[in-house]
Amino acid sequence: MANSFLEASARDRVQAVCDAGSFQEILKPSDRISSPHMALLEQPVAFDDGVVIGRATLGGVPVLVAAQEGEFLGGAIGEVHGAKITALIAKAVQEKPRAVLLIFESGGVRLHEANAGLIAVSEIMRAVCSARAQGVQFIGLIGGSAGCFGGTGLIARCCDVLIMSEEGRLAMSGPEVIETVYGVEEFDSRDRALVWRVSGGKH
């Protein structure tokens, strides 16, 4: 991986974590799966809707993988983005891989899509919990520059195992949101040491 995990793209992270050459992407950008809501709002779209999903091996054993792309709308979850992850989890219940790897990088719900994004988060959480009850193991990885916030943070806490890098951040609300609601006197989002003490992987 040419870049650090912190700065890498979703596909680079998958390639770095999984066995070399083993990743087989499901619903590639060439399939042109994007959010209908963004087009209606004349907002930019991505033909993978900001999440990469597929099959791979890790240490020689089969896994399913989903990796969020923080460079597209901060990795925010919308209807199609969420549906791809939920469908991958349904596939895991059928195929019974050794684990499902969820590589998180998201600020939470895609506000452009309002309730569709909130519903997508709840559907992913329900799918994870249901799959776990059927013996599927979930491993979450957090290390992207966008962090893991909002509804995505809730999904992360549903995993069996959660791995964070020192640069990873996990919280319900991001530092700027906390500052906006409670004021800079209560929480200064520019105080990087404070931010990392509260939500960072290294305490």
Give residue spans per PLM region.
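Conserved catalytic cores of soluble enzyme domains
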Residues: 108-203
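Terminal-region recognition feature
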Residues: 1-136, 197-203
